[in-house]
Amino acid sequence: SRELALQIDQVFKSMNTPFKAVSCYGGRPAMEEHRTIKGVQPSVIIGTPGRMNDHLSKQNFDADTVTTLVIDEFDKCLEFGFQEEMATVIGQLPNLQRRFLLSATDAEEIPQFTGLDKTIKLNFLNPEEQLTHRLHLYKVLSPEKDKLETLYKLLCTLGSQSTLVFCNHRESVERVGKYLQSQKFQCGIFHGGMEQDDRERSLYKFRNGSCHVLISTDLAARGLDIPEIENVVHYHLPANEDGYIHRNGRTARWEAEGNSYVILHAEETLPGYIADEPEEFILPQVPPKPSLPEYVTLYIGKGKKDKINKIDIVGFLFKKGNLNKDEI
């Protein structure tokens, strides 16, 4: 996804290596990326398949110098139907010496277009580490087939905890988001049909705590490393076990504990990939009022070109906003 490309770029730069990196993805002008590539001369280019093919076809960087290819979330790329685009990328890189395919779940087979005849499997999972004692599974029963009110009560009960709600379709994400907002519940939405700026703003606010709840499709289930997510809610159940594993993988990360909630109406049953019956989570008859976030994000669309710096902004918040140092 675009967000995963941006996240990898940010993490790579935060490591302070001597190697320069550039991220390339849709939703913004390719010409700006070309200028950045030309000016930076990066050692690492991180990109989505479509945008990478765009730059390769225009010869915006020298494909002959690329010796290493890494495909992150490889199995999901196949599931999303990116085989042709990935094959086209590989076909334009004549001097590849190493190919890495990364995923949290195993692929059934390696397609021929990868050019991998003999593979070496590296497994970084610790077989002795059990997630079950850190991830707590619950089912929440909805008296109505339309589970909106049950979701609302659950989120009110969870209060200010960071919660990621998964729906199976973009339209459902929009519908759930609008309903919660109509109930004065502050939440963000995230799906592939949104404008890139809106997607990034939703993630930014969720990361920094100015939004406790994010409603998303499975776009947020892969790769995105958002720390301290306390709860995952399956408003809709995923189609398969891999989807369930990756969704739950957004919580209980790095030795932390987390909770996974499955909302079921009377006609729904648990799928076969959920082997153990989850404990039922009983909602209170009268849920608490929606919790307000502790922080608010202000977007200031000005910068150095407008002769505005960080000191000006902080001074404005002190003098005009009457804020204290510990409030910023």
Describe the role of every protein-language-model region:
Residues 2-57, 65-68, 175-190, 201:
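Conserved nucleic-acid-binding Ia/Ib motif block in the N-terminal RecA-like helicase ATPase lobe
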Residues 14-15, 61-128, 273-275:
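Post-DEXD/H (motif II) to motif III coupling segment of the RecA-like Helicase ATP-binding lobe
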Residues 27, 108-154:
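Interdomain hinge/linker at the junction between the two RecA-like core domains of SF2 helicases
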Residues 59-61, 109-118, 177, 219, ...:
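Short regulatory helix/loop adjacent to the ATP-binding pocket of P-loop NTPases
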Residues 65, 213, 222-237, 259-263:
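A short beta-strand element within the Helicase C-terminal
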Residues 133-181, 312, 316:
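Conserved interdomain hinge at the start of the Helicase C-terminal
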Residues 213, 240-282:
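Conserved segment of the helicase C-terminal RecA-like domain
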Residues 283-328:
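Non-catalytic terminal extensions of ATP-dependent helicases
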